[in-house]
Amino acid sequence: MAAKQVLFADEARVRIVRGVNVLANAVKTTLGPKGRNVVLERSFGAPTVTKDGVSVAKEIELKDKFENIGAQLVKDVASKTSDNAGDGTTTATVLAQAVVQEGLKYVAAGFNPIDLKRGIDKAVAAAVEELKKLSKPVTTSKEIAQVGSISANSDASIGQIIADAMDKVGKEGVITVEDGKSLENELDVVEGMQFDRGYLSPYFINSPEKQVAALDDPYVLIYDKKVSNIRDLLPVLEQVAKSSRPLLIIAEDVEGEALATLVVNNIRGILKTTAVKAPGFGDRRKAMLEDIAILTGGTVISEETGMSLEKATLQDLGQAKRIEVAKENTTIIDGAGDGKSIEARVKQIRAQIEEATSDYDREKLQERVAKLAGGVAVIRVGAATEVEMKEKKARVEDALHATRAAVEEGVVPGGGVALLRAKQAITGLKGDTADQNAGIKLILRAVEEPLRTIVTNAGDEASVVVNTVLNGKGNYGYNAATGEYGDLVEQGVLDPTKVTRTALQNAASVASLLLTAEAAVVELMENKPAAAPAMPGGMGGMGGMDF
């Protein structure tokens, strides 16, 4: 076991906070409509230019191990916020830095860190309740467009295309983002279906950037039992291999020898396959497999109907234009099913909805109708260069997450105003001890920080703007894009409630844990001798292998 270095109390905290500041200062430059870009070096290919907080955070790894602890903790704030709300990563980072910096002053002054944490938790709970009161539901397409625009760094065209996509496939519909072929953003609605089952092995992934297995013009084998013996599959695999087309296998499960053989064939490029578990359970699984069969023009291979896997032919398989299999879901785009059969199936399910007695059954049946009839909206992002396209695509994906969050929990005034208005719920709050009161006071100062950062990035005086906004009421705030004060909701400056709430909760959670740390342990760096020069020409017998 390697030797460790241990630092205690202030000595540890100061080093850790230095790391917090390095990461937060890099991320916070991107906040607001006048936030700047950050350029990220890549080992291969062109650098990436981004305004996405979590993308910047993920790239930062510090040499000093104690500083790196701080950086990694704040990175965790950004990642968790991105996972839960899909946006608000920069706001979360700014809040975490503010809580840590303010908290450190109190700890240095002799306040008890545990009581400080309790005060912080009380203040955050009160602020979250106030945010819920401020929240208003998103009802119109215009509001959806406004939320999307703000999240995409005030790009109105991105907000509009997301609103159009939601109009076409519904707020619960499936929307995917792809690379475009022109300079303009385009929206296509493709007949398709998505279900919540992903690939059975990561070795099926053939698009590492998106972490998906993408199959173009595939066959679809639908089977209602487990597949564990590869011999059962061989006849149909041979037929598919002759056609030189990929294959998606949807079964109750694919395991053991069968899965291993499919993976090996896939890696070697002999037959491009992906296997997923069938969606749903029990009778619902049977019904969903039937839906997929009708959508793709195939047949469910089931012993109940007298069919067996060994005797399956290409005529029994479904087909689609494209299928994308991610870790947790599968999207079938443009299935080859007959339009009239799909219509009849939708009619049949709608009749079942009328007869359904439980809300749960009704909801599940409505989901099936949406999947069969709704389709998939594809936003194709256009740009002049690949670097610009990557940056723009990341913004579109962020905006899409933000609009979904807005539909889920509603919106609050943007531009850091909602957090300032939440101060009124914290102001009258009292803790059990003086130290808890200090924790509450700390949050009162920290919630100003997002607005201060937005204003600083816009080149204005932060303290003046914060005081002016605090003297106003309701939606009154500062629009950094125009440099004017006014009703931010009317001006379309909106933030999803879920994003603001998640950012505050995650920031306070990680930052207060950091304040209560009294020791830090890291591995000592070993002074290793310089590595020997590489052998010329590569190692024998390794020709043709990629590393």
Swiss-Prot record:
Q: Which UniProt keywords apply?
A: ATP-binding, Chaperone, Cytoplasm, Isomerase, Nucleotide-binding
Query: Where in the cell does this protein reside?
Result: Cytoplasm
Query: Per the UniProt record, which EC number(s) apply here?
Result: 5.6.1.7
Per the record, the domain of life is Bacteria
Q: What class of enzyme is it?
A: isomerase
Q: Which cysteines are joined by disulfide bonds?
A: none
Q: What PROSITE patterns does the record point to?
A: CHAPERONINS_CPN60
Q: Which residues form a coiled coil?
A: none
Q: Which Gene3D superfamilies match?
A: GroEL, GroEL-like equatorial domain, TCP-1-like chaperonin intermediate domain
- The principal localisation class reads cytoplasm
Molecular functions per Gene Ontology: ATP binding; ATP-dependent protein folding chaperone; isomerase activity; unfolded protein binding
Biological process terms in GO annotation:
protein refolding
**Enzymatic reactions:** ATP + H2O + a folded polypeptide = ADP + phosphate + an unfolded polypeptide
Where is ATP annotated to bind? 30-33, 51, 87-91, 415, 479-481, 495
- What's a single GO CC term here? cytoplasm
Q: Which HAMAP family match?
A: CH60 (MF_00600)
> Its quaternary structure?
Forms a cylinder of 14 subunits composed of two heptameric rings stacked back-to-back. Interacts with the co-chaperonin GroES.
Instruction: State the protein's purpose.
Output: Together with its co-chaperonin GroES, plays an essential role in assisting protein folding. The GroEL-GroES system forms a nano-cage that allows encapsulation of the non-native substrate proteins and provides a physical environment optimized to promote and accelerate protein folding.
Which NCBIfam families does the entry link to? GroEL, PRK00013.1, PRK12849.1, PRK12850.1, PRK12851.1
> Do you know which PANTHER family this protein is assigned to?
60 KDA HEAT SHOCK PROTEIN, MITOCHONDRIAL
Return the similarity comment. Answer: Belongs to the chaperonin (HSP60) family.
What is this protein called in UniProt?
A: Chaperonin GroEL
Q: Please report the organism this UniProt entry assigns to the protein.
A: Bordetella pertussis (strain Tohama I / ATCC BAA-589 / NCTC 13251)
